[in-house]
Amino acid sequence: MMRDFLRIYVLFAPNSGESCRISEFLVSHFDGLGMERDGVAIRVPVRFRSVPWIEGDPAPRKIDLEGADHNVIVLLHDPLMMEDDAIWNNYVGALRTSISVRNSVDLYVPFGSTQRDPALPFDKALHTQYARRDRWTTLKTQADRDNRLLLHLLLMIRRHLKSIYAPSSPDEPLFVSHAKADGDGTARAIVDYVNDTQNDVPLETFYDAMELLPGEDYEKRFESEIIKGTLLAITSDAYDSRPWCVFELTTAKRAYRPIVLADIATLKTSRTYPYGANLPKVRVIVDADNAWIEKLLVEALSEGLRCDIFNAQARRRAASMGLNAIITPRPPELFDLTVDEGHASTLIYPDPPLGNIESEILLKALAASGRKLELKTLSEVR
C-alpha cells in the first residue's frame, strides 16, 4: 500500500451533527489544495474517528500512524464529547502517547467546545491549549467560523512541516503586495484585520507602511521578507504598471515562493505584466463585511501548504535519486529558465505534465540556448 505524505484524522462525538458537518467540510477543502490543473491537485486524505469500531468497545477505530509520514489529529471538542469524556480521554491519551514516540513527525490540533467545556483530562495535564471557539462570537456566519477553523489548521500544519523540513529558516510572513494608487485600502484592511486583537490566528504580515524603519534600505528589506514568505498580490487596475509591484512579484517567483493573486480590478489593465501569470487568482469583492478577508487568507495558506507538501516530496525524491534539480511548485515557464545558473540537470514540477503548446515553447528555448535541462513531473522522477 502506498504511504501517504500527510493524513488528517478528525475526532468527534458520533452524535454531534455540527462536528460531523465540520468534518465533511474539511474533506471538501483538503480534497484539492491551491492550484489545480486539468483536474489534478494535491489532495490530503481526511479520515474520521467517531463511531465505535468493535462490538462491545465504545472507542473509535485505532489510528495507524505508520500509514503516513505525517499525521494531523484534529479534535472537535463539544458538550456531546464531554458526555463520554472517559472514553475520549483514554482514546486521545493512548493516541498522543503513540505520537510521542514518533520523533515529533505528527501534529495534534484540538478545537475547544463552543460552550467552553473543560479540556480532556489528558490534555489538561499536559497544559494543551485548545483553539477557543467560544470566543468566535464576532464571526457572524457559519461560513466565517468554518474559515477561522481552517486558518488555524492550515497555519499549524504549515508551521509543523517547516519545523521538520526547514527548521533553521525564519518565520514566514504574509507579504501583502499592492499598488498605493488603488490597492492600499484593500491591503490595509487585510493587515488591520489580521493584527486585530479579536483575531486569534497568529499570522504574521508585512505591510511596508507599518514595517519599514527610518534609514532602512527598503529594497533589501522587501527582498528579505519576500524570499521567506507567502506573497499575496492585490492586483488592482494599476498593479501591473507599478515597478515596485513588478519587483515584488518577480522576486517571489524567482525564489519559488507561494503566490496568490487577489483580483480587485474594476476598470481595465492597460498592459498585464508578462510574468504575472501561471499563478492561482481569486476574484475578490471588497465590502464592509470582513468575510472576504478570511476567505482570501484561506486561499493564501492553502496554496502555501500545497507548495510546502510538493517541495518536501520533490526534494526527498531528488535526494534519493542523486539529482541536482531545480524544484518549482508551479508548472515551468520561460522565466524559470533564467533563474538557475545552469548547474541543475533536471527541473521537477507538479503533475500533470505540461500540455503540448507550453512544452514546445520551453523545449525550443532550451534547444536555442544549448542548455541541457530535463523537465519532469514528480511522478516521472524514478
Task: Give names to the regions the model predicted.
Residues 269, 283-310:
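Charged, amphipathic alpha-helical linkers/stalks
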Residues 81-85, 117-123, 242-243, 268-274, ...:
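Switch/connector loops and helix/strand junctions flanking conserved nucleotide-binding motifs
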Residues 226-242:
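Catalytic-site beta-strand/loop segments enriched in glycine and acidic/polar residues
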Residues 109-114, 234, 262-264:
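Generic beta-sheet signal
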Residues 127-145, 278-290:
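Short secondary-structure boundary motifs at beta->alpha junctions and helix caps
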Residues 1-78, 86-103, 135-230, 253-258, ...:
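Conserved N-terminal substructure of TIR/SEFIR domains
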Residues 115-130, 218, 267-282:
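Glycine-rich, charge-decorated loop segments at or immediately adjacent to ligand/cofactor-binding or catalytic sites
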